[in-house]
């Protein structure tokens, strides 16, 4: 957010707009759950650093951390991937990643690119189960057409909430 637009889609949409819109939908759904307290690291067009995001979660001793994204590859690349991926770093996050991912795939209707381990800052430096969701590819015409639709974002939000609730046993 803020000065960092994130990835830029084929039609010149900013990743930050997809992510904020989707995250606000997730927040609205989670706030209906009496056992869940939601804290966002970004609720407007601001730019908290990765370090600040991890610090917020760690300082609050959050139970879970979810980072929402849309993937992209550089223009002119030989491949043009499409689909949804879920990333985690530490083994303690694997079950959470699998649980959310199983809801995300049917919700998006995009290719299943799997649950993958990667040392990403926010999933590595947070002290609770943490995942990063790549909900589609900005660099794919098919994915981009979905990413900016309200219906798609709502389905993603509902899938993430279903995964969180199942993981927490709610």
Where is each model-derived feature located?
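Short, electropositive alpha-helical surface patch
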Residues: 48-64, 121-132
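Active-site-adjacent mobile loop/cap segments within catalytic or ligand-binding domains
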Residues: 67, 74-75, 85-87, 114-170
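Active-site histidine-acidic residue metal-binding/catalytic motifs
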Residues: 1-54, 60-62, 74-75, 81-82
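Alpha-helix initiation/capping motif
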Residues: 12-15, 19, 46, 89-93, ...
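Sec/Tat-exported extracytoplasmic proteins
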Residues: 26-30, 34, 42, 61, ...
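A short, gly/pro- and small-residue-rich
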Residues: 79-95
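Solvent-exposed, polar/charged alpha-helical surfaces in well-ordered, non-transmembrane soluble domains
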Residues: 16-32, 55, 59, 94, ...
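Solvent-exposed loop/turn segments at secondary-structure junctions
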Residues: 1-4, 43-48, 70-76, 91-94, ...
């Amino acid at each position: 957010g803020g000065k960092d637009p994130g990835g830029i889609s084929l039609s010149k949409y900013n990743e930050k707009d997809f992510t904020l819109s989707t995250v606000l939908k997730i927040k609205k759904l989670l706030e209906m759950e009496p056992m869940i307290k939601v804290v966002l690291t970004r609720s407007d067009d601001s730019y908290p650093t990765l370090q600040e995001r991890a610090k917020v979660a760690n300082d609050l001793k959050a139970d879970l951390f979810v980072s929402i994204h849309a993937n992209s590859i550089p223009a002119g690349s030989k491949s043009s991937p499409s689909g949804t991926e879920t990333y985690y770093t530490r083994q303690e996050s694997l079950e959470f990643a699998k649980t959310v991912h199983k809801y995300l795939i049917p919700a998006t209707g995009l290719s299943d690119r799997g649950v993958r381990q990667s040392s990403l800052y926010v999933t590595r430096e947070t002290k609770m189960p943490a995942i990063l969701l790549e909900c589609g590819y900005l660099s794919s015409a098919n994915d981009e057409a979905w990413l900016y639709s309200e219906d798609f974002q709502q389905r993603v939000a509902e899938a993430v909430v279903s995964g969180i609730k199942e993981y927490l046993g709610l």
